[in-house]
Amino acid sequence: MTYQPKSDFMRVMMERGFLADCTDYQGLDEAMSKGVVPTYIGYDATAASLHVGHLLNIMMLRWLQKTGHKPITLMGGGTTKVGDPSFRSDERPLLGAEQIDANIAGMKQVFSSYLTYGDGPTDALMLNNAEWLDGLNYLEFLRDVGRHFSVNRMLSFESVKSRLDREQSLSFLEFNYMILQAYDFMELNRRYGCRLQMGGSDQWGNIVNGIDLTRRILDQEVYGLTSPLLTTSDGRKMGKSQGGAIWLNGDMLSPYEFWQFWRNTTDADVGRFLKLYTELPLEECDRLGALAGSEINDAKIILANAVTALLHGPEAAQAAEATAREVFEKGGAGEDLPTLTLTTDEIGDGISVVQLITRSGLAKSGKEAKRLIAENGAKLDDAPLTDAGLMIDADRLAAPIKLSAGRKRHALIKRAD
């Protein structure tokens, strides 16, 4: 794309690789060059924490605020009750109100690490769409809002079409999600002057619906901007690892494990991830991404430290690096490693290493743990673990032991005092 942006925000989006598509590049850029543009991203409360897959859009909101605009983080207290069908192969399980509220409380912990909330013109707002969705009158909603939507057009969106092409059913409940998200954009424009919705490229159809509805009912010019759906260079979906989701909440994934995820970045992804997930200057990102051989490991440590410091703070990043050095360079058992603490009742007369490997998260099942041992991939206190029938008693746990799966995944096992 040859367009040269006027606004700092659009320049950052283009230069650092955040931009997949925009409904009106020049119109949005012009608006952002003239004043504050309130902008929202919606987050449905499907889990108690956001994960690394959400981090790209969170960084977009951070850059938005840093370049003089107002971020709105919209919690989906209402839309979560319906479930977004975009590019899913099945219907989302429906959550109860208590679970949704608990998930929202967990999700909120992350945003204050990246955004400044308050009452100022560029201070972030945190809202919940249950505020306007829960009280809707269904018949009035159909008459006033539903009449503006063409079913033919909704069926043409790739997010819906791909599901129907696979002959997988799409419930009427899910089909309504697109209308509710469009209504969110209109309400945010009406109440808070919101002029831009951002999201992943899988949200394009939902965003366009919101733009059309806002124009039709409020006669307001609003915009949409999407980010690419990231995969790693080896084709894995961003935000997943062999051990499961990479959660952003520290109580669901320790800062050390989060740091280690970034330290294990594939060589080919380092430069790109530095641009997207850190605030290092572009020239430095390019320099670090071009390193080769053993030097690329220094770039990975810089990446891990920068990303972890943004989320968990500089001290947590430094502690994670120190733990990693102790574990990998000195063979120690760093205190910040993921830790499983067992009571004497849980240990009983002894607990098997297979159970310990599974319960510590180093394997997803007993079968996987046994295979890990059989293939010489497990270690106990840095010594090869070859006996899947080995039992660990309470005396052995008087001091912590370290279990390892491969070279990069470790956990401490401790006895409760």
Curated annotation (Swiss-Prot):
Alphabetically ordered keywords of this record: Aminoacyl-tRNA synthetase, ATP-binding, Cytoplasm, Ligase, Nucleotide-binding, Protein biosynthesis, RNA-binding
Highest taxon above the source species: Bacteria
GO BP term (any one): tyrosyl-tRNA aminoacylation
InterPro entries listed in its UniProt record: aa-tRNA-synth_Ic, Rossmann-like_a/b/a_fold, S4_RNA-bd_sf, Tyr-tRNA-ligase, Tyr-tRNA-ligase_bac-type, Tyr-tRNA-ligase_bac_1
Subcellular location: Cytoplasm
Placement of sequence motif 'HIGH' region: 45-54
Principal localisation: cytoplasm
CDD domains: TyrRS_core
Record's catalysed reaction(s): tRNA(Tyr) + L-tyrosine + ATP = L-tyrosyl-tRNA(Tyr) + AMP + diphosphate + H(+)
GO CC annotation, single: cytosol
Start and end residues of each S4 RNA-binding domain: 351-414
Role description: Catalyzes the attachment of tyrosine to tRNA(Tyr) in a two-step reaction: tyrosine is first activated by ATP to form Tyr-AMP and then transferred to the acceptor end of tRNA(Tyr).
Family classification: Belongs to the class-I aminoacyl-tRNA synthetase family. TyrS type 1 subfamily.
Protein name according to UniProt: Tyrosine--tRNA ligase
Organism, as annotated: Dinoroseobacter shibae (strain DSM 16493 / NCIMB 14021 / DFL 12)
